[in-house]
Amino acid sequence: LDWIRKPEEPAGAAGRPLTLLSGQRLTLGQFSRDKAVLVYFWGSWCGVCRYQSPIIDDLAADGVPVVGVAVRSGSSAEVAAYMAKRGLGFPTVNDEDGGLARSWRIVATPAVVLVKNGKMVHYTTGISSYWGLRARIFQADVFG
């Protein structure tokens, strides 16, 4: 089903500033210059995301560059409270109205997009294992 749900990198995505819940601003172009970045589209309302998010958090804790995108999950305070309650610490952008996800043509969550040097090099939807994602990240770093 991934080929049906394939996201599309929006024009200018590499240079578009993103603001994390922490207030830090970054661009995917800068953040993905040296290593592939895992961009994780998820929602607090998404049942499958409740299983995927701890895996993403483990990857981030192990040094994988991660940017979460909380899609239509409430205010920034609500997203931060949701993450704190579940012990999730990966950097996250609040996509309160879903506009960022729409610009990437994300039609299902959870969705993982790997970005290297500002370009999308891999994507998948649904649940993925820690080691499955690690393998994709390695592949993106070496061949991306």
Where in the sequence are the language-model features?
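N-terminal targeting signals for export/organelle localization
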Residues: 1-17, 144
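Short, small/polar residue-rich loop motifs at catalytic or cofactor-binding pockets
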Residues: 12, 35, 107-109
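Hydrophobic beta-strand positions
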Residues: 17-18, 114
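Short active-site neighborhood of thiol/selenol oxidoreductases, capturing the structured segment around
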Residues: 27-50, 56
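Hydrophobic beta-strand anchors of alpha/beta hydrolase catalytic cores
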Residues: 38-39, 66, 112
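Structural microenvironment flanking redox-active thiols in thiol-disulfide oxidoreductases
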Residues: 50-86, 96-102
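Thiol/disulfide oxidoreductase modules built on the thioredoxin-like
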Residues: 84-89, 96-144
